[in-house]
Regions:
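Extended alpha-helical targeting/anchoring segments
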Residues: 1-337
Length: 337
């Protein structure tokens, strides 16, 4: 793997604008600010292989062919990732797979009944990338890593050497009201059904959600930039696919694996950050002392301990932090590890 260093770009969104409209471009954005504890940002595009699909039906694309295969995308991903990439402990990524998995695919593994699908995108999509641009905020440098000096890589080099910030105002407009996929009557009916399940002891917590949609015009990348800079979430991401633009603004990392050690940090419990010092302290103390918030957090901790127990060595799962207060740009959270 080749490595070239460039000057430090503090804001990854500045230089991602160079590739944001390229094929399957991806930005993993740590939103460096006084609340962020992340070291790296990473971006890439134009994967050598694309793997996507639903259930046991997959599509594999490269620059020469497109194959439909009767096998789940995760198994295919393992197969194509056998060609290892050179490791560098100083970098978080030296080539490999980047993409997303949906709850819908997870439901298939758990044999949970699926409702009728009205959202025509893959349940899983991963690109295998052989180049990336990485910003290291600790040592304040930008690093281009690549396997081959392709035309795209050379173009990126040239653009970085002569880069000037583009202050283009991206246009984005909302052309309709938000619309839920549930009517008010349907929502109330389902809510009451959930209450009855809990009272009867069939379950003790349900994540009941609804999907909102609207019509829009303009640049999705523009709205991502605006929202990312407003929220400052440490696990933000922008994924540009032909079938969808995916934006993430999350304070929460689901899973981190380092060798044989796996970590999850569930968040349950929230209070707003106040500019008034006294009120802010009150919000933190209120969150610390909330039986309701602690009970919800503990439910998720127990759930994840159980999930880890299915895959980890017996007796190796432990809670190292319970009900810790962490502060982000706009909110205080109750976090366990």
């Amino acid at each position: 793997m080749n490595k070239v260093k460039f000057k430090y770009f503090e804001n990854p969104r500045e230089i991602f604008s160079l590739i944001e409209n390229r094929d399957w471009s991806v930005l993993l954005d740590s939103n460096q600010n006084k609340f962020s504890r992340q070291r790296f940002d990473m971006m890439t595009s134009d994967p050598t292989i694309k793997i996507y699909g639903r259930g046991e039906k997959s599509v594999v694309e490269d620059d020469k062919s497109k194959k439909h295969i009767q096998l789940d995308p995760i198994s295919l991903l393992h197969e194509y990732m056998k060609d290892s990439f050179n490791q560098d402990d100083s970098l978080p990524f030296t080539g490999g797979a980047v993409g997303f998995l949906s709850y819908d695919q997870g439901n298939l593994y758990e044999c949970i009944d699926q409702k009728k699908d009205d959202f025509d995108i893959p349940y899983i999509a991963f690109g295998i990338y052989d180049w990336a641009l990485i910003i290291n905020h600790d040592v304040k440098e930008t690093i281009l890593i690549y396997k081959k000096n392709t035309e795209l890589v050379q173009k990126i080099k040239n653009q970085l050497e002569s880069f000037e910030e583009d202050n283009t105002a991206y246009h984005f407009e909302i052309n309709s009201n938000y619309k839920s996929n549930l009517s008010y009557e349907e929502y109330v009916e389902k809510f009451n059904k959930i209450k009855s399940y809990i009272l009867e002891g069939d379950c003790y917590q349900i994540n009941f959600s609804q999907r909102f949609s609207l019509n829009y015009g303009g640049s999705c990348w523009g709205i991502y930039k605006t929202l990312s800079e407003s929220y400052g979430a440490p696990y933000s991401a922008y994924l540009n696919y032909p079938f969808a633009k995916i934006m993430c603004f999350s304070p929460e990392r689901f899973i981190n694996q380092n060798g044989k050690e796996v970590e999850t940090k569930p968040i349950k419990g929230t209070r707003p950050v106040s500019l008034d010092e006294k009120e802010n302290s009150q919000m933190i103390n209120e969150l610390k002392g909330s039986d309701k918030e602690q009970a919800e957090n503990l439910m998720i901790v127990d759930l994840l301990r159980n999930d880890f127990g299915k895959n980890c060595d017996f007796g190796s799962v432990e809670v190292v932090d319970l009900f810790k207060i962490e502060t982000f740009a706009n909110v205080h959270h109750l976090v366990s590890t």
